[in-house]
């Protein structure tokens, strides 16, 4: 469900499956474990294999963004499937979470 690739002060996390009410607590815990590294300043979420996300997922992402922002960091997403990208745009998430078309370092 989640793969993690650190690279200096940034990391890429691959989230797969669904990010809904049922999966949100587990994904939140996993992302919080990644963010325990306080030197991490940028988190990229690779959502290529994320098939569904609801408001619970939005909450998870915004909560982790707040953690990063509290230390001067940022978050971005990449490789979104059309339904997830539509939710991003309808909810306005693209205004606070950057959208990358491809990862700078290549795919995981």
Regions found by a protein language model. Give the residues of each.
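ABC-family nucleotide-binding domains
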Residues: 54
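STAS-like cytosolic regulatory interaction modules
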Residues: 1-51, 66-108
């Amino acid at each position: 469900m989640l793969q993690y690739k650190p690279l200096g002060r940034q990391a890429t996390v691959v989230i797969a499956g669904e990010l809904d009410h049922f999966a949100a607590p587990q994904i939140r815990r996993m992302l919080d474990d990644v963010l325990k590294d306080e030197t991490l300043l940028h988190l990229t979420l690779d959502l290529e294999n994320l098939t569904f996300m609801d408001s619970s997922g939005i909450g998870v992402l915004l909560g982790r963004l707040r953690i990063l922002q509290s230390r001067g960091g940022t978050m971005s997403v990449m490789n979104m499937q059309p339904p997830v990208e539509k939710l991003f745009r309808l909810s306005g998430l693209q205004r606070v979470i950057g959208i990358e078309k491809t990862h700078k370092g290549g795919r995981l």
